[in-house]
Amino acid sequence: MKLTCVMTVAVLFLTAWTFVTADDSRNGLKNLFPKARHEMKNPEASKLNKRDGCSNAGAFCGIHPGLCCSEICIVWCT
């Protein structure tokens, strides 16, 4: 009997704790990914399209295609 009461109180406490600490979900999925949605409407706004530190055509790259903006490297960026 004591064990049943302890288990019941523990379950009620954990349930209440879950509701108290849960995030506010009134907005639902409305603002879940606002930045991604903006970038889908305007692909130029995506930071993934920007390549900082890449070399333009004609620059020496050795054998590392990641150094070229075009991702094509045969000793020089093409």
From Swiss-Prot:
Expressed by the venom duct. The modification 4-hydroxyproline is found at residue 65. GO terms for molecular function: sodium channel inhibitor activity; toxin activity. Disulfide bonds join 54-69, 61-73, 68-77. It comes from the Eukaryota. Transmembrane segments: none annotated. It is found in: Secreted. Residues 1-22 form the signal peptide. Its main location: secreted. Keywords: Cleavage on pair of basic residues, Disulfide bond, Hydroxylation, Ion channel impairing toxin, Knottin, Neurotoxin, Presynaptic neurotoxin, Secreted, Signal, Toxin, Voltage-gated sodium channel impairing toxin. InterPro entries: Conotoxin (IPR004214), Conotoxin_d-typ_CS (IPR012322). The keyword Disulfide bond applies. PROSITE patterns: DELTA_CONOTOXIN. Residues 23-49 form a propeptide. GO terms for cellular component: extracellular region; host cell presynaptic membrane. The presence of a 'disulfide through disulfide knot' structurally defines this protein as a knottin. The cysteine framework is VI/VII (C-C-CC-C-C). Delta-conotoxins bind to site 6 of voltage-gated sodium channels (Nav) and inhibit the inactivation process. Belongs to the conotoxin O1 superfamily. This is Delta-conotoxin-like AVIA. It comes from Conus aurisiacus (Aurisiacus cone).
